[in-house]
Amino acid sequence: MNLEALCKEAELSFYDDELVSENGRKIYRIYVQKEGGVNLDDCARLSEILSPIFDVEPPVNGEYFLEVSSPGLERKLSKIEHFAKSIGELVKITTNEKEKFEAKIIAVDDENITLENLENKEKTTINFNDIKKARTFIIW
């Protein structure tokens, strides 16, 4: 099953998916994006496309709930493409060595992310494979 193609059919772009357990319930979440933002009708349209397919070809074993949503303003970055689409945004990164960064993403190539420190404007380049956890954030 090609989630990217199915999302495109609903005029959305696939961002990520995850399987989580909350209050003893298994939830399969699909995150999507769209120029101008995702609304409830977009999520419902994709859910209507996916539900009959998932009835025949379940994405996970056992009983689950399907959720379709946008990744939000403060979202997890887990793929190099996520970083590339987030150039200019603020990010919190924890590396595998437990170093922490709060910076602006200023450049991304095939394997490196270049950041600009928010306070001193110093630039740092991190290899994507050295990143344990990353998330965009907003200063309100």
Curated annotation (Swiss-Prot):
* Compartment list: Cytoplasm
Q: Which organism is it from?
A: Campylobacter jejuni subsp. jejuni serotype O:23/36 (strain 81-176)
Family according to the record = Belongs to the RimP family.
Q: Give the record's GO CC terms.
A: cytosol
Q: What's this chain's function?
A: Required for maturation of 30S ribosomal subunits.
InterPro entries, from UniProt? Answer: Ribosome_maturation_RimP, RimP_C, RimP_C_sf, RimP_N, RimP_N_sf
Record gene name: rimP
Which lineage? Answer: Bacteria, Pseudomonadati, Campylobacterota, Epsilonproteobacteria, Campylobacterales
Return the protein name.
Ribosome maturation factor RimP
Sorted alphabetically, which keywords does the UniProt record give?
A: Cytoplasm, Ribosome biogenesis
Superkingdom of the source? Bacteria
Question: What is an annotated GO biological process for this record, any one?
Answer: translation
